[in-house]
Amino acid sequence: MSSRRSSRGSISEEEINELISKLQSLLPNSRRRGSSQASTTKLLKETCNYIKSLHREVDDLSDRLSDLMATMDHNSPGAEIIRSILRS
């Protein structure tokens, strides 16, 4: 698709609709709505809110992991498992 865009310099309405549909399918709440299509503005707002919630969740998990690592013996099997997961 990017090669089609670069040769024309613009994106078609059909391509935009396809991208919006793909975006909608990635949002957890959008799946529950079934086939009803949300407005593009609402969908973009939901996407931004979802991304923000994912950032908060990552931050929370990072804090929890830091707290856990601070209380563990750094030579324990649990600490080694966590380190190996973080390396992968």
From Swiss-Prot:
Listed Pfam families: bHLH_ILI
Keyword Protein biosynthesis annotated: no
Limits of the bHLH domain: 1-54
UniProt subcellular location: Nucleus; Cytoplasm
Tissue-specific expression: Expressed in seedlings, lamina joints, nodes, roots, and floral organs including anthers, young panicles, pistil, lemma and palea. Expressed at low levels in leaves. Preferentially present in leaves lamina joints.
Family: Belongs to the bHLH protein family.
More details: Plants over-expressing ILI5 produce increased grain size, caused by elongated cells in lemma.
Protein name according to UniProt: Transcription factor ILI5
